[in-house]
A protein has these predicted regions:
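Residue-level detector of intrinsically disordered terminal segments
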Residues: 8-11, 43
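Sec-dependent signal peptide recognition
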Residues: 2-7
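C-terminal motif of bacterial Sec signal peptides marking the signal peptidase cleavage site
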Residues: 13-16
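Lipid interaction determinants
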Residues: 18-82, 93-160
Length: 160
């Protein structure tokens, strides 16, 4: 009986100690970019137009988590708001603060198209059911050079 026990134990040692064969590495060829995080995917310049509300908005999101929001409602000049943004990768929720440390009027659920050319922001504020769909578009110099810089205040709040 002891011989059987020793034999079984010896076999177990050999089986358990067997090293798995190495998996072959990737075949040579063009390198594949790793999938971008949501934060990386939304970095860039975006444009939103809402004809029913008369709003024209350009949004720039930078790698260092800063934003510039150029907003024009109706006629007149674009108003520039600046601040910082952050995104929760797990819940895909975008939030931010203006330069005066005031939080945005809402956090936003974020969705980006597979080709990275469309950004949809859905306000999480109570009662808000609209979606804001932005297209990837460079902010024109005519907008950035002729805007009115605003520090957010109670008197004039942006749509963002």
């Amino acid at each position: 009986m002891k011989k059987i026990l020793y034999t079984v134990m010896a076999l177990m040692c050999f089986v358990c100690c067997d090293k798995p064969s190495p998996t072959p590495g990737p075949e040579p060829g063009p390198s594949v970019q790793p999938e971008k995080t949501l934060a990386e995917a939304i970095i860039g310049e975006w444009h939103y137009t809402d004809a029913s509300f008369g709003a024209d908005i350009y949004l720039g999101l930078t790698e260092n988590k800063k934003f510039e929001l150029y907003q024009k409602i109706g006629d007149g000049a674009y108003h520039l708001y600046k601040g910082s943004w952050q995104i929760d990768e797990e819940s895909a929720v975008l939030s931010g603060k203006y330069n005066d440390s005031q939080a945005w009027g809402s956090e936003y659920d974020v969705a980006i198209s597979g080709d990275g050319k469309t950004l949809t922001l859905s306000p999480k504020a109570s009662g808000a059911e609209e979606n804001h769909t932005y297209t990837r578009e460079e902010i024109p110099a005519s907008v950035s050079e002729n805007c009115v810089t605003v520090v957010k205040s109670e008197d004039y709040s942006p749509l963002f």
